Amino acid sequence: MTPIVSLEGRTIVVTGAGQGIGKALVETVIELGGNAVAVDLNAETRGTVVAAQPADQVLAVQGSVSDSALANRAVAEAVARFGAVHGLVNNAGIIRPAMIEKMTDQQWQDVIDVHLTGSFYWTRAVGQHMLERVKGGDKSGGSIVNSSSDAGRKGAMGQINYAAAKAGMLAMSMTIAREWGRHNIRANSVCFGVVETPMTEVIRGEKFRDGIMAQIPLGRWSTPQEAVKAVCFLLSDGASYITGQHLGVNGGFHISL
């Protein structure tokens, strides 16, 4: 029987691969038989992740996701190394929290550049390659997964920049699905709740912990390892008829008032 989730022979580009969800994604993609292109700004954390994986299944790329030229070069390197790119996970993220009236132009722009503009650059670069493959007769298409958040659906106090960017990523997934669906290129979003990563340390701290936990029916945070299972499913042929969707992986947080 064919496994529901397999990435055997697939090459997946993962941005923000140095820690948290991205690190777990690289590990799981390789565990499922795929190749991972690990993209991260931090050379040290990215290097640690890559060093722990089989050298013939991973390609390291250092730089900012908001650099469009880097996206183009990385895709070209991945194709030269592995033959093709079959999937993309736009996972890189930062937070610059502040209430609306106190948020600076730079705080706003930093978050938009990484989450929204960066996701567009990498989607365009990977999508151009996928479309070329389709023109060449390869009908396998591809899968793009945007790492969004419940903040994009419900808003987030003190994070209008983050919430707006994540909402934009939801719209991006639906637009990709509409434009490229006829080429068998799928696009979906995963809306994470609170995952145990370095980026969520503040909201998992004593000041906010009890209030947020009370809104999660399962009563616990997600681990990166369980969070990425949904992403890998959407990348796989098990999700071959799923596109334009927003999948909540949040312990039920989205149904809380």
Sequence positions of predicted segments:
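Short, small/polar-rich loop/turn modules that mediate ligand/substrate recognition or access, typified
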Residues: 181-186, 242-244
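Substrate-binding pocket helix/loop in short-chain dehydrogenase/reductase
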Residues: 99-100, 104-112, 212
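Residue(s) in the substrate-gating loop at a strand-loop-helix junction
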Residues: 149
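C-terminal helical subdomain
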Residues: 189, 210-238, 242, 249-251
